[in-house]
Amino acid sequence: MKKTGIVLVLMLIVVSVLSACSSNGNNSKDSSGQAGASTEPSKDVVKLTFWGGVPPEAGPQEIVDNWNKANPNIQVTYVRYVNDDSGNLKLDTALISGQSVDIFANYTKPLLAKRVSSGSALDLSQFTDYGIDDKMGPGAKEWAVDDKYYAMPTKRNIHFVWMNKDALDEAGLPVPTDWTLADVEKYAKALRTDTRWGYAMFPFWRDIVSFDGSLAVQGYVKEDGTSNLGAPIVSEALQRQYDMMHTSQVSPPISLIETTKMNLIAEFLGNKLAMLNAGEWVFRDANNGKDYPRDFKVAFAPLPRITQEQDDFRYLGGLGDALAINAKSEHKEEAWQFLKWYADGGMLPMAKGGRIPASKDADQAKALELLLGDSKDKYDVESLQRILNNDLPTFQVTLPQEVIDIRREEFDKYYIKSQSLADTINNVVKRHNDYMKRK
């Protein structure tokens, strides 16, 4: 009996403890009902990952911080990929392999078209509450793929030649307002010194800036269906570039730039390069006086024509930074909300790095103020405004990325003296024709 009594007592104690624990657990749940909305929001918070090519410190981090503060239920994380061949491969691999990518920036139309064909970019026509054409203007159409928007262009693409104004003044040269590659070489010869190159072009743009403006009008394919990449304007442009590298030697050869990983922006801002064919993205370093101190003023000139008679010349520009939504994203609606906000002014923190919003509803005066910042006295503002206010005819490269790669391969063989100009043109035309036959 004694043993039985002890067992009963122990059982009662256990039941009592369990009951108390259960009661406390229920009370805790009930009492935290209101707090649960704040202490357990993670169940309702949507997390988006935004991939872009701009360094976080150059504006993107401030952008997502501003968004996240105002939108606690939709939190965005920025992932930077370098906008070069390896960086774009990294993004494409992430898209195809199902890594966390909800929104991604495209910097050339051929790369966007490639991502559309792979099923990575969402057709934005399903969203009807935002008129891309109305907001961005007629230039937006250049980013349409098969007459549909798979990405929203968000900034004005502005390409021009950065010039050392002090060096120009010393040489008695005016800031050009309309010039040719022959003029560029003349300027480069006058500005070249033992410690300073005269002129350079970003390797990434070396095969498209010079002559694609004309081919965009003439067409990359002739009426008979064969390649037009052998047009006379192409040969002339290649010859001019080659001569500046190897004959007058006013430009660093492509091989030198790539083998030494020459930082052309640093070369220009360090007074080791007098003229740089680039674009608005250089502002993010030009305004960085800590890492790139300089004691000279910068002026701006339009991109050079190949010849003065080039009546069909178009300027590389239009709109850029086309943001797309991953077709496999689980949060397409939330990503779209972010895109609209970003385009209409959310992206302004990047204006200090040269990215001017394209949307008519973004504050353009604020963008220019941010662009110049505290460095206004370091620029020839008159020449900059001439570039910004010029309503020049522009184009976007529409060649498939594979053909662009073919051209670059063949052009580089010419630039490094491993094949003649005639062989280069013949090879490009043949490979382009072969590509079209495969397609």
Predicted regions, residues:
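A structural signal for short loop-to-beta-strand junctions that line the ligand-binding cleft
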Residues: 92-93, 101-102, 131-167, 195-198, ...
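Helix-loop-helix "hinge/cap" segment bordering the ligand-binding cleft or interdomain interface
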Residues: 69, 75-76, 144-207, 218-256, ...
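Short, solvent-exposed loop/beta-turn-alpha elements that line the ligand-binding surface or hinge
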Residues: 40, 123-135, 177, 217-237, ...
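Extracytoplasmic/periplasmic substrate-recognition and gating elements
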Residues: 69, 75-77, 171, 243, ...
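Long, aromatic- and glycine/proline-rich binding clefts that accommodate carbohydrate-like moieties
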Residues: 142, 352-409, 413
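Short, low-complexity disordered leader/linker segments with a strong preference
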Residues: 1-48, 69, 426, 430-439
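Hinge/lid segment of periplasmic solute-binding proteins
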Residues: 107-158, 212, 297-301
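Extracytoplasmic "Venus flytrap"/periplasmic binding protein-like
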Residues: 66-136, 170-172, 267, 271-275, ...
